[in-house]
């Protein structure tokens, strides 16, 4: 009788809270994990959340600058209800980036560690092994030097669209992309972590209600770039079935390099390591503490584009390389040969990619700097190698982008439009064409909206800034206060597009604006307060750069667009 009463009390408790009375426990191939349930106000579907599930061994000691290894098994029920540490990076900058980009209402203080190969899972609470829901694997951005999985709460996307959301982490900066260009440290460790996470998903996600045969990889900025790398990589074949690159593709020149030796030597010199051989450099760097490598990262001033820096003596990014493992060839060759994973692909940009966030983070062209034409040319010539364009065409480009104006504000706006086009917009169009021509179903968008919870420092005329689309994708207007009905409706529409694509390889469904496939007519979707079809994204700019670069021979050591 007593046991029966206890059962009825437990059942009543379950009904009141809307969740099962016991927290979720799931078997993985390495051991059991304990999660928690989360509910959204006004939404009947609650979500099971698992935070910090290990997908690889901690990449410490001899595993620094080495491929990730499978996690060790455990015999207990592992508690996965707290955020894992983000991968090693500057803590202040990492926290600031998290606070700027998170879709959460509350502020979460995150930790940082070299032991960071974990993933977070959000799945509808009523999942079973037979649910077979689409899986959406998120790869965060941050210039391959910053960011983490826990900035992005996947519960809204999971609850509203009945999908399993997996947010993964990968090694960053020196830990993720240090390369000597040979067998001692090939590089691309961060991309190998991404591949390892996808293997983990294939092996384990069914137990969380996911369908390993329906996996979509999606990411933004360096995450979108990483998605594009994985689309080209033979290493990731059959590990996913659809892909979405938001504001980032493999042709972003700043995130790819052919000559790794100068940066490797600079890092070794800063660390006080002998540079006699690659083996000596790698052995020495493996002995350094995490704090010592963080100091080197700080001295390198990665991502910052200060006009005071000597670009010939410094490196702004630690980049993806041709390693014969992740990438067997230059991405341009792979695209030209059409020898890649021709999965359905969404590629998108924001209307003003270099509107406010990136110039602020990179400390480039501060608003109080009065630019004239001569100074603008000098500034852009200084960073020509980063944009991947020959210096001698910059004066012509400045004429195009300043539109005949000598107004310092308009010249500054022109420079930022120039950078946004060269780094994000033109490469995205070129990659979309390559995928279309290879026979992959391709969809293209431009996001045009000003989020209500943007930083108060951001100018009101920056509509569609870098990363703005991420707020809609992860349901920020639903989680955070202050969003208008228009903004909530926009987010629900974007989540529906993304989830439809994850389900079917096609974003369209009844009740949504029609999103045309990107074919020879180059139709695409403008997403914003008014969502509508348009044609030939950035047509004038694409034609300008294509013609300009075709007239000139590339300079050595530059990766041209």
Curated annotation (Swiss-Prot):
Pfam families reported in the protein's UniProt record: COesterase
Residues of the active site: 221, 353, 466
Span(s) of short sequence motif Prevents secretion from ER: 558-561
EC number assigned by the record: 3.1.1.1
Stored InterPro entries: AB_hydrolase_fold, CarbesteraseB, Carboxylesterase_B_AS, Carboxylesterase_B_CS, Type-B_Carboxylest/Lipase
Role, per record: Involved in the detoxification of xenobiotics and in the activation of ester and amide prodrugs.
Name the UniProt record assigns to this protein: Liver carboxylesterase B-1
Species per Swiss-Prot/TrEMBL record: Rattus norvegicus
